[in-house]
């Protein structure tokens, strides 16, 4: 039976770049754990800002975060007040110096992570899962996605037995390395239990094989 490899891990160094970029010979496990803690902390603090991914770079004891968000204004705040507050909160919690950079996501409708989280929020508001999936798929296609696949797994519509249902529109070539596949996962905590959501979005082919910056 065929299994699906993670679309990012499959393309690392070819068309995708690492989200954590640093080198360490001794403190590697501690840094990996710290990176995960930083991402969770930032995501919780600014969840309402539509954060897709957080890149982490380390150099000389200083940590640089690149936050990809659909609403940069919420993170930065008036005259940079909010981003400065976030930087100070990070410094106090992790006892390290941080440099924060905000990158705007121009089309959140074609960002897989934001799409997955959007579906999760709809399911938690008791929107029918098929309606939520079809609406999201239509939006992504309207905003330029060449293909999209959405999968929901769990006690869908309160069913006794958990199952997986998926919906696809367009082309999603997971085995083509030059295909620019965006991938996102989210979980919806409903009254019937947890529902897992996975989203694959095909944005076109990268023909020059340059790793994304």
Swiss-Prot record:
Part of the 30S ribosomal subunit. Forms a tight complex with proteins S10 and S14. One of its GO terms (cellular component) is cytosolic small ribosomal subunit. Belongs to the universal ribosomal protein uS3 family. SMART domains: KH. The keyword RNA-binding applies. InterPro entries: KH_dom, KH_dom-like_a/b, KH_dom_type_2, KH_sf_prok-type, Ribosomal_S3_C_sf, Ribosomal_uS3_bac-typ, Ribosomal_uS3_C, Ribosomal_uS3_CS. Keywords: Ribonucleoprotein, Ribosomal protein, RNA-binding, rRNA-binding. Gene3D superfamilies: 3.30.300.20, Ribosomal protein S3, C-terminal domain. The keyword Plastid does not apply. Binds the lower part of the 30S subunit head. Binds mRNA in the 70S ribosome, positioning it for translation. GO terms for molecular function: mRNA binding; rRNA binding; structural constituent of ribosome. This is Small ribosomal subunit protein uS3. The gene is rpsC.
